[in-house]
Amino acid sequence: MTTKKRPVGKKKFVSFSDDDALSRTGRLPKNLPQHGSPPVYVRRTWQTIPFHLIVLSYWFIKHSNGYDVRKCTWLLVPCQVLYLALQFNPATVYGNKILKLNYALLAVSGVTCILLTIPCMLLVVLFGAPFLEMLDKTWLLSLHCCVLSYPAVYSVLNSDFKVGFFKKYFISIAVGCWISCLAIPLDWDRPWQEWPIPLVVGAQLGAMFGYTFCSQL
């Protein structure tokens, strides 16, 4: 007696995960790297271009009253939060998932950025920044740089401190500051040469480059 073989169908899997993440399967473009890519990375897309930094830099250079770094930093804070929520986080892939925005982590990342102003300020002073004479302005520069790095800080915390990929964003901001220092000693006696105005602009330009092109590197 011959026995009939049952047709082998596709196995069905049921997931009981309570993770609020969105799976990449069927939700992301097929041209994403599947092999050899880091466990956490940012997709190559125009979505990560920080258009708000272009507008803010133009306002700071052309229309701000006396190059007000304090006001520029306060304007930057909500812009960076919206940029993270609407542009950077949706383009960031954690393993095989895009995680929804973690509101508690937004606050934690903000506090982390404030705490990072202290080592950032010490680093700026070690590179030759005025310390006692313009301590408030040096701290404002450090705060501005840390706010610029806010999306990268959030992503590092959200990926269990996988700093390897996101360090490029911090480096681009630091390099922008470093290059812009060349404008200060020039004998032009212009208002925009005062500390720390050139470095604020340089940090913004470095952040523009980083958030636009670091996903390609």
Swiss-Prot record:
GO MF annotations in UniProt: mannose-ethanolamine phosphotransferase activity
InterPro entries: GPI_biosynthesis_protein_Pig-F (IPR009580)
Example of a GO cellular component annotation carried by this entry: endoplasmic reticulum membrane
Involved pathway(s): Glycolipid biosynthesis; glycosylphosphatidylinositol-anchor biosynthesis
Ranges annotated as spanning the membrane: 45-61, 74-94, 111-131, 138-158, 169-189, 195-215
Keyword Transmembrane helix: yes
Membrane topology: Multi-pass membrane protein
Primary site of residence: endoplasmic reticulum
Pfam families in UniProt: PIG-F
Keywords: Endoplasmic reticulum, GPI-anchor biosynthesis, Membrane, Transmembrane, Transmembrane helix
Subcellular location: Endoplasmic reticulum membrane
Family affiliation: Belongs to the PIGF family.
Free-text function comment from the UniProt entry: Acts in the GPI biosynthetic pathway between GlcNAc-PI synthesis and GPI transfer to protein.
Name of the protein: Glycosylphosphatidylinositol anchor biosynthesis protein 11
